[in-house]
């Protein structure tokens, strides 16, 4: 007989860190997803097996984008209102929003049955232009929810602005991973740390054109001392970025395509630093993965992970996404100054707890236990 679970986690589809969160709750939770995969994560999701005994999928054989909207809304609504769990935590991100009509009306009905409906929230004031009318509408559609588990301080401030000032809110816990998932791989951490690494989707938001031009200038400046550059990921602009690397005559750039988490961990373990120059990044979960393997980071100031788990000159460098000289200098220092690099490596230890699923469990315990 299956143990009764008191918590339900809801998301559009499952990623490896979704399973990390589920496992962190020690058998007290189920996870419900809408589809087996979704854009823009399909390549990553298809590159590895993502499963768990407590994971349920409404459309187990379909991508989110293959499901007609009317059918999806009906099935999601019915799946939610039939749930027995006392605490239901609605994810935010990908293709799911707590103010989508199927989610919203299900939340209202669940509240009538005295369910404790919470949300996970990782957006903030700065991720896009805001409209007063839309913001007012959001405050209405967020009324059924009794609390929020947020990614960081800016997300917590934003949700409070949207009507959660008197509700339970955490400013930690959303974007977390199980660090042991990276430590358990069958390889030793490479002590040489002899290349730079980018991990992410190949699209304009990630600012790869800028990064390749920065890398070209870095190579011109350092000559034979310049480190190779590896890029992991797929996406609509991949071929254009490969062509740009050829046009810039970058012989030490390697595009690895989509990789499994085990392969990413192996690449991270040998990286001198992880580079994330994104024009905007809601979080950047790969920063957590870098912390797992004690890898310093150079991140754009618009990567929201830097609010909580990156500190300037402690475990990384924070640079404007259009500051070419700043990026070149940062890469140069990390390349040639072994003492500084060692200091950054040691600094990653400070952020292991906050970036790990222990932080997620702590946030859930706070919201579930203390919310009536």
Task: Enumerate the language-model features and the residues they cover.
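Donor nucleotide-sugar binding/catalytic pocket of nucleotide-sugar-dependent glycosyltransferases
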Residues: 143-184, 190-191
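Conserved donor-binding/catalytic core segment of Leloir-type glycosyltransferases
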Residues: 188-217, 230
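Nucleotide-activated donor-binding/catalytic signature segment of Leloir-type glycosyltransferases, i.e.
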Residues: 239-259
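Short alpha-helical donor nucleotide-sugar binding micro-motif in glycosyltransferases
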Residues: 258-259, 266-271
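Aromatic "clamp/platform" in nucleotide-sugar-dependent glycosyltransferases that forms part
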Residues: 279
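Short hydrophobic beta-strand element within catalytic cores of glycosyltransferases
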Residues: 296-300, 310
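Conserved acidic donor-binding segment of nucleotide-sugar-dependent glycosyltransferases
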Residues: 312-313, 317-324, 331-338
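A charged, aromatic-enriched C-terminal amphipathic alpha-helix characteristic of glycosyltransferases
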Residues: 326, 339-369
